[in-house]
Regions:
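A glycine-rich, hydrophobic/aromatic-adjacent loop/helix-cap motif
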Residues: 1-188
Length: 188
């Protein structure tokens, strides 16, 4: 029986944040990303939201032995859903593919009490840069809603548990894209 795969569209695109080695760039149709928060976490995070006619880049990776326990724990604020729409990838052996998304009735827009963490944005952008180059980073920003939410600048003392060290050019790229989308970056 083939291993199932997950479709990651945020921090899971950054291979440095997980150990799922059998991974491939992928695109899924019918979805966008949005910044949301729930009562399950003190800060905002990305979720996938249905969006007819839209497509987002991401990463699919095998879940060996159908063992979802560690990934479900990491993604505890999300529900796991089967991917039923068009999915494009080069994985020769992908079984069923699942996507994590927050149920709309359990989420709300980010606010000052539930900001987006810059250290989280850094991780996601680093992943997209490594998988898709600068064009992929631009597509990430363009296919994600909620950049008007407060972004807490925690870069010097990262709060995000899977934060990564960014090179100076990666930081400049993140900062330039945040300016381009008129993001609201606030001091920590």
């Amino acid at each position: 029986m083939k291993d199932p795969f997950f479709f990651g569209y945020g921090s899971l695109v950054n291979r440095a944040t997980h150990s799922y080695a059998h991974a491939f760039p992928a695109q899924i149709s019918g979805w966008r990303r949005a910044w949301r928060h729930t009562t399950l976490r003190p800060v905002a995070f990305l979720t996938a939201v249905p969006a007819h006619g839209e497509q987002i880049d991401g990463l699919i990776a095998a879940v060996p032995g159908h063992d979802w326990a560690a990934l479900d724990e990491r993604e505890h604020a999300y529900d796991r859903h089967p991917v039923t729409g068009p999915l494009h990838h080069q994985a020769p052996d992908a079984g069923d593919v699942q996507i994590y998304a927050v149920a709309p009735q359990h989420s709300d827009s980010p606010d000052a009490r539930h900001p987006i963490l810059l250290s989280y944005v850094d991780v996601v952008v680093q992943g997209y840069l490594r998988e898709y180059g600068e064009a992929g980073v631009i597509r990430f920003f363009d296919t994600t809603d909620g950049w008007d939410a407060p972004i807490k600048d925690d870069r010097s003392a990262p709060i995000y548990p899977r934060h990564q060290t960014l090179h100076a050019d990666e930081k400049r790229l993140v900062d330039a894209q945040l300016v381009r989308v008129s993001a609201n970056v606030v001091a920590a």
